[in-house]
């Protein structure tokens, strides 16, 4: 088992929770980004910097993640790719992507994108990351990792 982080947009608090979980449970962790990331101590932490470009980090994660791995991402299309190949994906706010929910999440993402593109709605994006988001993620991660490690 390995934890993959779509690191470009992952909140720092989520990364810190993941580093602690990786160390505590002795699970390898890989951050993937298209820019250099701060160094993180620990023999189980790896950073991969991919070329700059649309979906390059997502493609790397989708190609390298195994069905026994956990992918942490806010990117719904990447999560859909992981779930389609039998993998496990969790968003940084603690919501598990599933075969049942991924279609609806993709449709909502596409609808909101289209509405923004046509000017029917302004702004967009999620609310600022909060302490309750952090706590929800930590709780979901803990139960998910324990369940995955028991397999």
UniProtKB/Swiss-Prot annotation:
Q: What is this protein called?
A: UPF0178 protein GSU0171
Q: Give the family per the record.
A: Belongs to the UPF0178 family.
Protein source organism: Geobacter sulfurreducens (strain ATCC 51573 / DSM 12127 / PCA)
Matching entries from PANTHER family are given as: UPF0178 PROTEIN YAII
CDD domains reported for this sequence: PIN_YqxD-like
InterPro entries (UniProt xref): UPF0178
Top-level taxon of the source organism: Bacteria
Which residues are connected by disulfide bridges in this protein? none
């Amino acid at each position: 088992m390995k934890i993959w982080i779509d690191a470009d947009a992952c909140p720092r608090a989520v990364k810190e929770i993941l580093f602690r979980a990786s160390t505590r449970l002795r699970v390898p962790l890989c951050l993937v980004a298209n820019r250099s990331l701060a160094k993180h101590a620990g023999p189980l932490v790896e950073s991969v910097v991919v070329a700059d470009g649309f979906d390059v980090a997502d493609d790397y994660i989708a190609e390298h993640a195994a069905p026994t791995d956990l992918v942490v991402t806010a990117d719904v299309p990447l999560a859909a790719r992981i779930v389609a190949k039998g993998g496990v994906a969790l968003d940084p706010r603690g919501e598990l992507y599933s075969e049942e929910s991924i279609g609806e999440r993709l449709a909502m993402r596409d609808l909101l994108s289209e509405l923004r593109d046509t000017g029917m709605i302004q702004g967009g994006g999620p609310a600022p990351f909060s302490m309750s988001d952090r706590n929800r993620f930590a709780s979901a991660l803990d139960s998910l990792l324990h369940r995955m490690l028991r397999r």
